[in-house]
Curated annotation (Swiss-Prot):
Protein name (record): Prephenate dehydratase
Domain Prephenate dehydratase: 7-190
InterPro entries cross-referenced by the UniProt entry: ACT-like_dom_sf, ACT_dom, Chor_mutase/pphenate_deHydtase, Preph_deHydtase, Preph_deHydtase_CS
GO terms (BP aspect): L-phenylalanine biosynthetic process
GO CC annotations, alphabetized: cytoplasm
EC number: 4.2.1.51
Residues with site note (Essential for activity): T183
Domain ACT intervals: 204-283
Originating organism: Corynebacterium glutamicum (strain ATCC 13032 / DSM 20300 / JCM 1318 / BCRC 11384 / CCUG 27702 / LMG 3730 / NBRC 12168 / NCIMB 10025 / NRRL B-2784 / 534)
EC category: lyase
Pfam families recorded: ACT, PDT
Catalytic activity entry: prephenate + H(+) = 3-phenylpyruvate + CO2 + H2O
Amino acid sequence: MSDAPTVVAYLGPAGTFTEEALYKFADAGVFGDGEIEQLPAKSPQEAVDAVRHGTAQFAVVAIENFVDGPVTPTFDALDQGSNVQIIAEEELDIAFSIMVRPGTSLADVKTLATHPVGYQQVKNWMATTIPDAMYLSASSNGAGAQMVAEGTADAAAAPSRAAELFGLERLVDDVADVRGARTRFVAVQAQAAVSEPTGHDRTSVIFSLPNVPGSLVRALNEFAIRGVDLTRIESRPTRKVFGTYRFHLDISGHIRDIPVAEALRALHLQAEELVFVGSWPSNRAEDSTPQTDQLAKLHKADEWVRAASEGRKLN
């Protein structure tokens, strides 16, 4: 009897850029060397929840793009507790094909469907080339192609492979308002021990702070005084009390790097809540190990770092 396939959830249907990222992760061995079963999801939340609920062993989701910045639905999906973590990342060059049902010309296009993030990357092309066409929001770029196949949109901006999958004709290829635009994707699994540091790693956490003057400055200063670079910080509403926020932080370095560990210990002491989202190899050279010889000796914060790196419950 053969082993069951490894289930990987992703933003579907087939023909999305997320599916292309899934293939890159698979080629890199992120999901192991066994058979892979793809599980299309309707949203990043649904994909990540598939891992939380044990329906999938992994999920692949977009987290940041060159044109429109952070993919906030992914941040919200990760901010649901500490039982999933990011283990790898990949970047894709993003350019779209404009696809239609066979026999349709650009002059016939009155509606174009694509994901809202995709629309931000083709809207100038639309304004110039098909100025009278209306944009229709789709749950993914692949779903936009499906809408064309089903007759609910005249055209879609999607990866070229989607045309083959849905029996469409590509009228224009390599459409992108910003040349060289890229999107970063991450692979997510259930909480477990982190991989060993590589010297070029990225760590991500989510935290909330007391709503008092200076709390965020004091928290971020813990990283500055230890020479730890912050590559991204985003705020998202807590959805509990109006005007209160949780912060998503990307850090250059690994949780087992001493400067990063020190800074996270100090942040743990200040935060109302601190969620570990993962430490993983970065594909960017600037995410290098910080250099410092400072040591922290606070037992409670030490225990938090050990628990995070060993895959145990975080207190």
